[in-house]
Amino acid sequence: MAKSVFNQEKVDFTKEHMFFGADQNTQRYDVFRHPVFDKLNQTMLGYFWRPEEVSLQKDRADFQNFRPEQKHIFTSNLKYQTLLDSVQGRGPCLAFLPHVSLPELEGCIVTWDFFETIHSRSYTHIMKNVYADPAEVFDTILDDKKIIARAVSVTKNYDAFTEAADNWTHHKKGSMREVKKKLYLAMQNVNILEGLRFYVSFACTFAFGELKLMEGSAKIISLIARDESQHLALSTHVLKLWSQGKDDPEMVSIAKECEEEVYDMWRECVAEEKDWAEYLFKDGSMIGLNETLLHKYVEYIANRRLKALGMKQIFDAPVNTNPLPWTQHWLSSSGLQVAPQETEVESYVIGGIKQDVDEDALKGFSL
């Protein structure tokens, strides 16, 4: 049966599962089954920004003075980032949103997808300011074998889930458990994408920024990284609610059943990111960064993500020792201390309200 955009039956959505429950009716944000998603949504909305707010005037001159190997690193990463956010600019709404049962998660996913579109516009903003003809970069993305090879692993679980969900929803082909299994793997794939696949390219852009090169681009990527940390938190919360039995009970056994497959997905991603690092530095490394350091960094990030999911760390890098400690202040908004008139202030939150203030907090104030 086709889904309705407005279910006229009364439903207590605080008792529904996150996915494949009753069709939704009123979008209400006063009572929640999982309040964490509304809090995440509020945080993301408070971080609203536009790439045009960041000046790229100096970046154009910096890029023109780059050596060929530096241009290769910067351009290849931009192309790869464009691919990833092209997937995420439509993936969450296309794949997950039709099957969401909770208003708070629905709102969170819509905001998530909207910010991914800002990221895609950001890459266009950088290209239009740095290259004489941005089309020369855009038109070669689908011709780049290294990028297309990555597109397969990035999208295959999304596509498998959307196909299975469509077959079940509209044709009653397959089984609900199989659809849920593919949903679980698709969400794990998103967690890997948001939590690891960007970080080699992030590190390279931040390394240029550390050298006072392409600083505008580095600040834009820092804003994107801040957003991606929220998107990572979203998928991490979904996965942990499933594995801990706090949502759909059937997802507990599905999580256990898929555990080794998930570890293989992480291994595949780490191998691909290491291969990408080698491709970036095939003509030479850059000051402060080389493929060996990036290999360690990829394993370090992967282990941290696995730990956050409550899974075992399967790589050699210790989770408490960052091989690239200087990247941290680019990934932390509060670490960038700048004058407001000079650049985009990343730690500024729009519409931030503290709602848990009691009467005691106002003691000592008088009018």
Question: Which positions does each model-derived feature cover?
Answer:
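Non-heme di-metal
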Residues: A2-L367
